[in-house]
Amino acid sequence: KKVYDSCRSKECLRDIRVYLTRDAQELINAGGIASVKPREAELLCVSIDVERIQFNRGFYSVDIRFFYRIECEISCVIGRPRIVDGLAVFDKRVVLFGGEGGARIFSSQYIEDGRDVQLRPDSNKPTAVVEVVDPIMLDARVVAPETSCNCCCCALHEVPRSICSCFGGDDLVLSNDGYQLFVTLGQFSIIRLERDIQLLMPAYDVCLPRRDCSNSGVGGEQDPCEIFSSFDFPIDAFFPPQSDKAGCLFTGSAGVNDNRSGCSCGNNN
């Protein structure tokens, strides 16, 4: 595959709504919350949709939805701390160049002494690939109903069945009634458009995209997003370092050229 365009993203996702399980929602609705401690954020799934941009030939919009499992520790005025979990969702759109090829591809599967199986027709339209590392939990807070955001941007009306199964069958509360939990996450990702193409070319070391498609700003003093802005992009997480004995022209991060999504819960059952 040939990569036609790519970009990297280092984003601070501020105040993302967490849709809690029913038991967790009842806990925070009871009030008396003393503190909220962020514990863990796990990326469950990424949903990708690629569409051609009509007014700009060769360019495509890539709409991405990230699904996270969020775990926090809530301390109440009375009683011991409780662990709660829920679902957070973040939507992102980027525009990348993918070329104008539109060839139709027909292929078959070989059958000895029989008629070959005709495979489903395909095309060489670009494919979007999103590489992400698990996000970093930067902040968490519970907001009272009278001050929470009840706009449409916070509304989630439907959750894929495969995502719901990651919460042990517990129902997720999608309504905007009652107290709400918000978290701030730091996320690194690489997004690219690629096509199947017949080329013979030499292979070099890792190539980190030059373009930055982050769309989050930097907060104020002691802001979690400001802290996250000081983090280095984790190149080795996307491109595992090679052995020094490989004899390559470029090695490690010093040689960096700045130039099927499976929805599961991390088990192989």
What is the meaning of each model-derived region?
Residues 1-269:
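Viral structural modules
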